[in-house]
Every structure is written in structure tokens, then in C-alpha cells.
Amino acid sequence: MNAAAYKQNFQRTVQKSDIPTCNIMGVDIAAIDMEWLLNYLSGNIKDLAGDYICVSNVHTTVTAYEDEEYCKVQNGGIMAIPDGGPLSSVGQRRGFENMKRITGPSLMGEIFKISAEKGYRHYFYGSTDETLEKLYKVLTETYLGIQIAGMYSPPFRPMTAEEDEAIVERINETNPDFIWVGLGAPKQEKWMAAHQG
């Protein structure tokens, strides 16, 4: 299965128009705060299956401004959250008073805190085996009851179509609620867009 096939099969069941946004250099950045985001995710977790969220900062926003295809990737998920302080500052100056910085690590921490209670399952894709082992140890010691569905460190080279299909099947078999992708920008956003659905 190739990337195009994933996109053809994906049909969003929630409305992007329900999310307030501030367009910054062509990227629709969610004009929200952490509380709004956590409530939204908790209330729509099943409907968001197969979708993605970009954690956007100044670097990714400028890159999207300069690269039309990457801009489509940034805008193609359910939302792009304001990881960069300057993004939320621009939004606030434009009248979006509730637009606050939401860093990737802070979002992860907040999701992990409620995961045992909500029964959320997590899959981690990216980095090295050593880093994933350390992450597993920290998460299971810090967030009691967290369900880690799986972890995978992809090769540091382009994957073959067969390898990609195998890992997608492996991830799907674990039935995660969240797939945390750590490949570095812009690679991670492109991976999420290619595997949307």
C-alpha cells in the first residue's frame, strides 16, 4: 500500500470548522489553550482515529510558507497547535485571547496523566531503540497504569514499500489511541500525512 492509498481511504468524521484558527503565513494554527485541546481530544478520541495533529513552531510555519506541499501537510491534519511562543503571541495580538502556547512535551505529559483513567493506548514511532527503551522506563515509572501498545525505531533510510506496509500493519494490530511520531520536522509531519487514515 502506498501513501496515496492511505489518503484515499481517509474520511474525517469531525469538523475542522469547530476548531478556532488563526492563519499565520498560510498555516491555520489552532487558537486554543491546553484545557480546550484536552477536552476536545477526550470528547472526540474515537472520531479522530486516523487523523493527525501538527505541533507547529516558527521553523515549521516558515518552512510551510516556503514549501507549498509542506503547507498542505501542516493544514491537512485535524489541527496544528501553537508549540512556538511567537505563534500564540501573534494570535493574541490578532484578537485570539485564548490562544496559548502548547508544547509537544507538555501535551504528551497531560495526555499521559489521564491515560490510565481513560484507558488510552500509546504507540511510539521514531528515534532510536536506546531512546525508546529509556522512554519506556520513564513512562512506566512516572505514569502508573499507562498502556504502551508498542514502540518502533525505523531505519535511518527510506523504507521500502513492503517495510512501510509491515509497520503500518503492526501499528494497527496494537490498536493505539495515540501514535506519537518523533522523526524531526518536516519528516514527522510528512509521515503522518502520508499515513493519515
Give short role names for the model-derived ranges:
Residues 1, 119, 195-197:
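N-terminal hydrophobic signal-anchor/signal peptide
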Residues 68-72, 138-141, 196-197:
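Short, solvent-exposed amphipathic alpha-helical segments in soluble enzyme
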